[in-house]
């Protein structure tokens, strides 16, 4: 459950290290975002010579949450951190590598590129 002002780790090599959610996209009064949802973020920490800079406003897709994902069979998949992957204007990942596991819930949507780059899909 990601909401406005939530900090997330970045799970790709775009150059950002930490981002803050400034808007949950999809509806005028939408409060929370889960795995697979697109959010508007601002870069709070970045590495030198990265593709994105501190202060930039970008879109991102949530790939891991501490809250977890409830599956149809009743199982719950939780993670130790909240993480996102930075997206460009065409909703394609900015980075060329994904770090850490991602969930199968991304597969049903338009994020097959993230699924193919991820080292582990749960």
Curated annotation (Swiss-Prot):
Keyword Repeat: no
One record GO biological process: translation
Residues passing through the membrane, by range: none
Highest taxon of the lineage: Bacteria
InterPro entries named among the record's database cross-references: Ribosomal_uL14, Ribosomal_uL14_bac-type, Ribosomal_uL14_CS, Ribosomal_uL14_sf
GO molecular function, one term: structural constituent of ribosome
Pfam families assigned: Ribosomal_L14
GO terms under cellular component: cytosolic large ribosomal subunit
Keywords: Ribonucleoprotein, Ribosomal protein, RNA-binding, rRNA-binding
Assembly, per entry: Part of the 50S ribosomal subunit. Forms a cluster with proteins L3 and L19. In the 70S ribosome, L14 and L19 interact and together make contacts with the 16S rRNA in bridges B5 and B8.
Family classification: Belongs to the universal ribosomal protein uL14 family.
Described purpose of this protein according to its UniProt entry: Binds to 23S rRNA. Forms part of two intersubunit bridges in the 70S ribosome.
Protein name (database record): Large ribosomal subunit protein uL14
Organism: Saccharophagus degradans (strain 2-40 / ATCC 43961 / DSM 17024)
Lineage of the organism: Bacteria, Pseudomonadati, Pseudomonadota, Gammaproteobacteria, Cellvibrionales
